[in-house]
Amino acid sequence: MKDVPGFLQQSQSAGPGQAAVWHRLEELYNKKLWHQLTLQVLDFVQDPCFAQGDGLIKLYENFISEFEHRVNPLSLVEIILHVVRQMTDPTVALTFLEKTREKVKSSDEAVILCKTAIGALKLNIGDLQVTKETIEEVEEMLNNLPGVTSVHSRFYDLSSKYYQTIGNHASYYKDALRFLGCIDVKDLPVSEQQERAFTLGLAGLLGEGVYNFGELLMHPVLESLRSTDRQWLIDTLYAFNSGNVETFQALKSAWGQQPDLAANEALLLQKIQLLCLMEMTFTRPANHRQLTFEEIAKSAKVTVNEVELLVMKALSVGLVKGSIDEVDKRVHMTWVQPRVLDLQQIKGMKDRLEFWCTDVRSMEMLVEHQAHDILT
């Protein structure tokens, strides 16, 4: 049995400036107000004044461990994550988290958060295989939770960092966006916003199978790069989203300075040419999606002889559906893959909808005026 009153009294004497906080903890503990005590401890462990040295480890050993069985499991893990940060030996931290996981197994969210913390530690020490296995286990558990919870953001932060470490651009792009979707970006320091926006932008450009940039372009995190020396990345992303090959080539003096982009120039060119074909299809009226080889060649900056190969590539990866008329050198498109649109593309849709409404009104007037002739 630990001497909790003695520890609290000693702590009050050791730090006169924080005596009121320690006194409050003692008061709530003595009154057995476990919920209020939990909230007070959560505030306590996040206070930089107390999060120094091994103070939180001592707090856990001499105080929290005495009533942890009365604490909400998820709140307990939240508290313990702060304690673990003061453990310099990863092995000790991992053992501590494993024991905690057993204590909170009644709550799926608490177990998920605990496993995510274990995965983060494994990633930090370079154990990629165990990190991968942990991510797969946790993802399966997350899929069974209703809606988005407080543990989702921590999981997506871990999974995106893992994919970044192994160089899987497409998976990083997907999960890093999910992470941002679970938090308020204003809570991140500007420097972190800029770093996340930059790595996300690069991953989107380089990611295999990533043809949807609308969600990133509409996210406020990207604004952190505006009016900085990385503004060129925003311009490049907008060029890709609209399939503007000419703008992409004009920006080469900027993106060409980035080693990863420069090394993958051929891949980037093919991707933006495919996006150009998608945009050409999307902006055409549904009843007029006949594209000539010459039109495609001009917009995508390819030769007429290369058009058929470009269209076949777009068809094979499921970006568009349609058929190629080799004799007339035309492509008839019937479908284009849905994407998140930027504001300019939404405006284009609005204009086309207004044009369609005008057509409908004209037909209505025609029928109204000539109904007698038609019926007789």
Curated annotation (Swiss-Prot):
GO MF annotation terms: structural molecule activity
Keywords attached to this entry: Proteasome
GO annotation (BP), single: ubiquitin-dependent protein catabolic process
Matching Pfam families: PCI (PF01399), PSD13_N (PF22037)
GO cellular component: cytosol; nucleus; proteasome accessory complex; proteasome regulatory particle, lid subcomplex
Domain of life where this protein originates: Eukaryota
Ranges for domain PCI: 171-338
Classification via PROSITE patterns: PCI
InterPro entries, per database record: PCI_dom, PSD13_N, PSMD13, WH_DNA-bd_sf
Protein family membership: Belongs to the proteasome subunit S11 family.
Task performed by this protein: Component of the 26S proteasome, a multiprotein complex involved in the ATP-dependent degradation of ubiquitinated proteins. This complex plays a key role in the maintenance of protein homeostasis by removing misfolded or damaged proteins, which could impair cellular functions, and by removing proteins whose functions are no longer required. Therefore, the proteasome participates in numerous cellular processes, including cell cycle progression, apoptosis, or DNA damage repair.
Subunit (UniProt): Component of the 19S proteasome regulatory particle complex. The 26S proteasome consists of a 20S core particle (CP) and two 19S regulatory subunits (RP). The regulatory particle is made of a lid composed of 9 subunits including PSMD13, a base containing 6 ATPases and few additional components.
PANTHER family (alphabetical): 26S PROTEASOME NON-ATPASE REGULATORY SUBUNIT 13
Name the record gives this protein: 26S proteasome non-ATPase regulatory subunit 13
Organism encoding this protein: Gallus gallus (Chicken)
